[in-house]
């Protein structure tokens, strides 16, 4: 059987959980992935849901209501696409074990959210901090002043004599 290009393509970067993600969440996701790989959907579902709850706790958005916690997490991190939280709510809020494809989707979606929060969010903050330092270091006396542009069609001031 021939191997397709999609079989050899590297996994998207967000699927590899970065070291910036808190260790307790990473450990639970590793367990969820291991269970998924062995088709232990009950264990995998429990682990990913525990990982999500741990994220709520770490992010200080924990509520008894799973959906309310997701809303709070989305409000805390508005740069994360709301659709990701909707998928997590749909798949993660129940008590029953998920089927393999749904479990895979929940794990991948949660990894995407974690990537947005802990990797891209951190990179954005680092970029902004660097740019802020550069701007503060500018010597305003050596920065050319911006001259106002004359508007086309504006009346000119003539001296009266």
Where are these regions (language model features)?
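Charged alpha-helical initiation segments
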Residues: 1-41, 144-161
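A ubiquitous short alpha-helical element
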Residues: 12-18, 36, 55, 74-80, ...
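Short runs of predominantly hydrophobic/aromatic residues within well-ordered alpha helices
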Residues: 25, 44, 48, 52, ...
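Small residues (Ala/Gly/Ser/Thr
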Residues: 32, 51, 95-97
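Hydrophobic/aromatic-lined pockets within catalytic cores
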Residues: 37-40, 56, 60, 115-118, ...
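Long, charged low-complexity segments
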Residues: 66-160
């Amino acid at each position: 059987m021939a191997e397709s290009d999609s079989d050899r393509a590297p996994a998207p970067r967000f699927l590899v959980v970065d070291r910036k993600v808190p260790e307790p969440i990473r450990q639970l996701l590793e367990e969820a992935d291991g269970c998924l790989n062995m088709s232990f959907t009950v264990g995998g579902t429990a682990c990913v849901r525990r990982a999500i709850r741990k994220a709520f706790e770490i992010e200080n958005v924990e509520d008894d209501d799973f959906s309310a916690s997701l809303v709070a997490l989305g409000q805390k991190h508005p740069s994360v696409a709301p659709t990701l939280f909707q998928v997590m709510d749909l798949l993660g809020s129940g008590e029953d074990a998920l089927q393999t494809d749904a479990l895979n989707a929940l794990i991948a979606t949660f990894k995407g959210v974690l990537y947005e929060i802990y990797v891209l969010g951190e990179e954005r903050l680092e970029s902004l901090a660097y740019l802020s330092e550069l701007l503060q270091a500018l010597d305003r006396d050596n920065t050319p002043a911006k001259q106002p542009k004359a508007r086309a069609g504006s009346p000119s001031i003539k001296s009266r004599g």
